């Protein structure tokens, strides 16, 4: 926070003299000291075409935005009707625009790195552990289990004289890999269970220990480990133990292990045995499954990818039968596979049943060029409760009976849920074609729904004040939670969504400011709740497909600010675009385009959002410090109304889903601010939570 109490996003360093001169030099080509207005207008259109090449309804140059409107906007910010403006006069006008300097963004990026370097070893370790610790602990559990069973078998067969005398080095390699394969396949199959993850996610601490957001990455990684161990296991038998066991000079040792009826035992007999055939067929199918799971195959035909995964059922069956002969030890693999296989099999049978026998009536509607909206009623026979932030698997029989795709539940009011779907893939593009052209009118379709899975951040509802920091698509579940909270608030307090009369005298002007402004503490209702929502993306395109959701929140916030005497739900949306533009002209015009909002089109021409867009990396140290000072003011108001609140702890939840370096900074800052709350007696506590979604 600035020394004068300004918010971090208002405490900016404006364009330096060098940057202003560089911008003017780009306009003053002939060096005559005059800036041609037509050149300014041309440059504005050129930069807009570079930044927003596919105009959407909110863009500056859409069909309904007249040339006169653009001309008036340019004349207004330039502040002159001259066609040729003196360079010095134009320079002063550029400075009056108060555009942030490019250097400040670079300094913020450097500050984030130096902040962590300046931390002491203990503080750095605590911050690192807060972000990565539970995930590391889980991976350590998986690896230690693999090592434990692998080493157990290694020692057993290496020290067993009769094993190596009969089957040589191959049995040691094969059985060591087999020992490691038991827990590997257990975790591999278990990572495919959606019902288990949904159930366990109800526990915050288990969700911290097991990063469900990385379940797909974990599944791919452990599959690679499994196919490697399985290959080494096969090599150990095919080129080692089978060769040694079929030799005449080793028949005595083989007879002592397998019995006198087991010899003579030629190589082909080992191959044709139950362990040999089941192992080879299972390994071959495993290779086929891996090939059909390659990114190239998945991208070209998702249906082939999903059908390929059906091979896992014969693979698991063969693996369960693989050790039932009990040649060297009692059967073990089947016990490891029984529970996870039963879970996954139950889920898949349920999905097939839902896809073929239970169709859900739904509507689909085009929102913009990148997004469609699917609405459906929750079937009454579903036992799972639907919540915003969860996800469901969606099937559309008109497109495919076998393709199921996961989508986040945007909102869930009553018995109706909504899905906002970005149509940037093959299947989603075909889904868009089911709509009634580009008219925006809803079209009736039938869908299959499997879910819900995952869970919203359960502890989010434990805090009256929360800070949400998300990067890219990771913030999607929280955007759904925000919309859900806002619609419930509208319903409880007769907001715009209830259909109550609105004051329409100046709604556009109000909306142009976007988001919710600061309110005086005395106007807060007893059930006041505040959420600071910081969404960081690399480029503006990432903001477009969620703009409809966030704008619904912004509109409601503006409506309540104007009509309600007391604030009940206060959502403050801050969107940050971090993409760097080294060209000063691009930077300036990007800022001007963001400023261009009219009563007819109050949204940003670049992002489609009502709330102001901030360019550059957010300084979360200043943001959290500013938030702390505001919480002190709010706590003082509570104490003034009720003195007993003085000794009460005031908890703020900080939910993070993004890059680790930002998470470490937030974790460290939360500890420092909590310590500050103890020192100054405010007893404000910041609880850092690394959120995962899957």
Predicted regions located by residue number:
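Amphipathic regulatory helices of Ca2+-sensor modules
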Residues: 1-8, 22-24, 35-64, 73, ...
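Non-transmembrane, juxtamembrane loop and terminal tail segments
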Residues: 3-7, 108-117, 363-381, 495-519, ...
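Membrane-proximal cytosolic interface modules of multi-pass membrane proteins
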Residues: 8, 265-268, 311-320, 342-394, ...
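Acidic, divalent-cation-chelating loop motifs in proteins
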Residues: 28-30, 78-80
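Reductase modules of NAD(P)H-dependent flavoproteins
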Residues: 76, 419, 424-428, 433-442, ...
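Membrane-embedded alpha-helical bundles of multi-pass integral membrane proteins
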Residues: 118-353
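Classical protein tyrosine phosphatase
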Residues: 216-240, 471-504, 508, 521-534, ...
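Ferredoxin-reductase
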Residues: 363-444, 534-538
């Amino acid at each position: 926070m600035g020394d004068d109490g300004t918010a971090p996003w208002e405490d900016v360093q404006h364009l330096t003299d060098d940057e202003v001169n560089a911008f003017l030099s780009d306009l003053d080509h002939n060096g005559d000291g005059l800036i041609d207005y037509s050149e300014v207008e041309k440059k504005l259109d050129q930069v807009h075409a570079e930044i927003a090449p596919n105009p959407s309804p909110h863009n500056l140059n859409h069909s309904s935005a007249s040339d006169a409107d653009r001309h008036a906007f340019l004349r207004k910010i330039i502040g002159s009707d001259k066609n040729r403006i003196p360079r010095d006069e134009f320079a002063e006008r550029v400075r009056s625009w108060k555009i942030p300097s490019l250097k400040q963004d670079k300094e913020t990026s450097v500050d984030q790195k130096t902040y962590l370097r300046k931390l002491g070893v203990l503080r750095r370790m605590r911050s690192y552990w807060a972000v990565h610790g539970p995930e590391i602990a889980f991976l350590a559990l998986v690896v230690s289990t693999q090592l434990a069973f692998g080493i157990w078998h290694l020692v057993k067969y290496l020290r067993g004289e009769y094993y190596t005398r009969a089957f040589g080095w191959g049995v040691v390699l094969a059985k060591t890999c087999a020992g490691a394969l038991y827990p590997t396949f257990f975790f591999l199959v278990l990572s495919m269970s959606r019902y288990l993850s949904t159930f366990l996610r109800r526990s915050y601490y288990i969700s911290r220990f097991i990063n469900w957001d990385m379940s797909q990455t974990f599944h791919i990684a452990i599959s690679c480990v499994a196919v490697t161990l399985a290959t080494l296991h096969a090599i150990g038998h095919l080129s080692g133990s089978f060769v040694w066991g079929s030799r005449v000079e080793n028949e005595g040792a083989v007879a002592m292990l397998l019995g006198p009826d087991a010899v003579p035992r030629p190589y082909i007999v080992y191959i044709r045995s139950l362990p040999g055939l089941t192992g080879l067929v299972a390994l071959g199918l495993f290779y086929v499954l891996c090939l059909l799971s390659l990114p190239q195959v998945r991208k070209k035909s998702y249906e082939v990818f999903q059908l390929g995964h059906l091979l896992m059922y014969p693979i698991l069956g063969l693996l369960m039968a693989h050790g039932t002969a009990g040649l060297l030890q009692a059967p073990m693999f089947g016990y490891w596979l029984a529970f996870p296989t039963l879970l996954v099999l139950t889920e898949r049978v349920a999905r097939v049943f839902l896809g073929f026998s239970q169709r859900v009536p739904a509507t689909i509607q085009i929102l913009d060029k990148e997004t469609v909206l699917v609405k459906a009623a929750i079937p009454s026979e579903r036992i799972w409760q639907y919540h915003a932030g969860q996800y469901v698997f969606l099937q559309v029989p008109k497109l495919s009976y076998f393709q199921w795709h996961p989508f986040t539940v945007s909102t869930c009011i009553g018995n109706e849920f909504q899905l906002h779907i970005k149509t940037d893939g093959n299947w989603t593009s075909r889904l868009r074609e089911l709509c009634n052209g580009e008219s925006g009118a809803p079209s009736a379709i039938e869908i299959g729904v499997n879910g819900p899975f995952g869970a919203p951040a359960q502890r989010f509802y434990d805090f009256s004040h929360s800070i949400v920091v998300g990067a890219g698509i990771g913030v999607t579940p929280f955007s759904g939670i925000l919309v859900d909270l806002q619609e419930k608030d509208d319903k409880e307090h007769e907001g715009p969504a209830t259909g109550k009369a609105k004051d329409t005298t100046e709604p556009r002007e109000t909306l142009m400011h976007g988001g919710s402004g600061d309110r005086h503490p005395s106007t807060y209702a007893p059930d006041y709740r505040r959420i600071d929502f910081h969404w960081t993306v690399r480029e503006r395109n990432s903001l477009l497909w969620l703009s409809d959701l966030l704008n619904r929140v912004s509109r409601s916030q503006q409506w309540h600010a104007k009509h309600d005497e007391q604030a009940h739900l206060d959502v403050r949306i801050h969107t940050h675009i971090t993409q760097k533009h080294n060209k000063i002209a691009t930077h300036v015009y990007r800022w001007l385009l963001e400023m261009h909002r009219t009563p007819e089109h109050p949204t940003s021409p670049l992002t489609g959002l009502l709330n102001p867009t901030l360019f550059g990396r957010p300084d979360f140290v200043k943001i959290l410090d500013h938030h702390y000072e505001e919480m002190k003011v709010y706590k003082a108001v509570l104490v003034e109304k009720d003195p007993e609140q003085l000794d009460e702890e005031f908890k703020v939840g900080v939910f993070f889903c993004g890059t680790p370096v930002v998470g470490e900074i937030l974790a460290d800052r939360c500890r420092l601010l909590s310590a500050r709350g103890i020192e100054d007696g405010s007893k404000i506590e910041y609880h850092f939570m690394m959120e995962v979604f899957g």
